[in-house]
C-alpha cells in the first residue's frame, strides 16, 4: 500500500541518515532533504545523493537538546559496545539502555548514561505475578538496586511475567505483594523500579499488557519509586 511504501521509505531514510552522518560527517537535515528529493530513485542512487550533499555543505548543525534519546544495544547486531557508544554520542543519543552492570561503566566512559538498567530478575516470562518466584526475585533485586544507585543511575526494569490463567485482580495482588517487599530499599537508594508494559500479541500471555492494568498496579504500590515503561 502507499502507507507501507512511505513507512519503508522513511525507515530507509533513517538508516541511511545515521550511516552517512557517522561515516561522512554530513548533517542529518541535509541528508534527509537529499534523500527525500531523490524520491523513488533512492533505491538506486542513495549513495550518489549523499555524496552530492556532502559536496554542497559540511556544516554541522548542533542538536537543540529538546528531546533526550535512548537506544537499546540489542537491536543493532554485532557492534562492539565501545564502537556503538561512539556512534550514539556522535549523533546526539544520550543513553544506551537495557544493559547489565558489567556494561554500565563502558557507556559512562563515553559520557552517556543508561536510561533503563537491567541485571535483576528472571526475565520477561517469570515475574512478580508468580508468588513462588518472589523470594528469588526479591533476592536478585536486593543485590542490584544498590548497584544501580552506586553507578549514579535511576531506573531498573522489572516484569509482571506471564498471566498463567490468573484474573486481573489476582495478578494485581500477586505483583503488589512481591514488589512492596522491595519498595523501601528502592526508596532508600532513590532507584525507580519500572515495570514494562508489553503487548501480549508479541509476548504471548504477558500480564501487564495495557495501561489500565499497569496504572492500577501503580496506584496499589503507591510509591514514586515504582513506575511504568512503555514498549
Question: Which residues are covered by each model-predicted region?
Answer:
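N-terminal secretory signal peptides
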Residues: 1-26
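C-terminal segment of N-terminal export signals and the immediately downstream linker at the start
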Residues: 18-21, 47-79, 86-87
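N-terminal export signals
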Residues: 24, 30-52
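Residue-level signal for the nucleotide or nucleotide-sugar donor/cofactor binding architecture
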Residues: 26, 136, 209
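Alpha-helical elements of Rossmann-like donor-binding domains used by nucleotide-donor carbohydrate transfer enzymes
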Residues: 30, 34, 83, 143, ...
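Short linear capping/connector segments at secondary-structure termini
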Residues: 31, 160-164, 196-200
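Structural motif corresponding to the early beta-alpha repeats
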Residues: 70, 75, 94-183, 187-192
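Acidic/histidine-rich catalytic cores of soluble enzymes
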Residues: 85-89, 181-231
Amino acid at each position: 500500500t502507499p502507507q507501507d511504501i512511505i513507512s519503508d521509505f522513511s525507515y530507509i531514510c533513517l538508516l541511511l541518515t545515521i550511516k552517512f552522518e557517522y561515516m561522512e560527517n554530513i548533517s542529518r537535515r541535509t541528508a534527509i532533504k537529499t534523500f527525500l528529493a531523490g524520491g523513488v530513485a533512492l533505491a538506486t542512487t542513495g549513495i550518489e545523493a549523499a555524496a552530492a550533499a556532502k559536496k554542497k555543505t559540511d556544516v554541522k548543525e548542533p542538536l537543540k537538546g529538546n528531546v533526550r534519546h535512548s537506544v537499546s544495544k540489542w537491536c543493532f547486531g554485532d557492534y562492539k559496545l565501545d564502537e556503538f557508544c561512539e556512534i550514539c554520542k556522535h549523533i546526539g543519543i544520550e543513553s544506551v539502555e537495557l544493559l547489565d552492570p558489567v556494561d554500565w561503566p563502558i557507556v559512562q566512559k563515553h559520557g552517556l548514561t543508561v536510561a533503563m538498567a537491567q541485571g535483576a530478575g528472571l526475565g520477561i516470562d517469570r515475574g512478580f505475578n508468580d508468588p513462588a518466584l518472589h523470594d528469588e526475585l526479591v533476592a536478585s533485586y536486593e543485590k542490584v538496586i544498590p548497584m544501580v544507585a552506586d553507578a549514579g543511575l535511576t531506573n531498573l526494569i522489572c516484569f509482571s511475567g506471564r498471566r498463567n490463567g490468573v484474573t486481573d485482580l489476582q495478578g494485581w495482588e500477586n505483583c503488589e505483594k512481591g514488589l512492596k517487599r522491595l519498595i523501601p530499599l528502592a526508596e532508600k537508594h532513590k532507584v525507580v523500579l519500572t515495570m514494562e508494559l508489553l503487548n501480549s500479541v508479541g509476548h504471548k500471555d504477558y500480564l501487564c499488557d495495557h495501561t489500565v492494568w499497569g496504572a492500577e498496579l501503580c496506584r496499589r504500590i503507591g510509591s514514586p519509586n515504582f513506575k511504568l515503561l512503555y514498549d
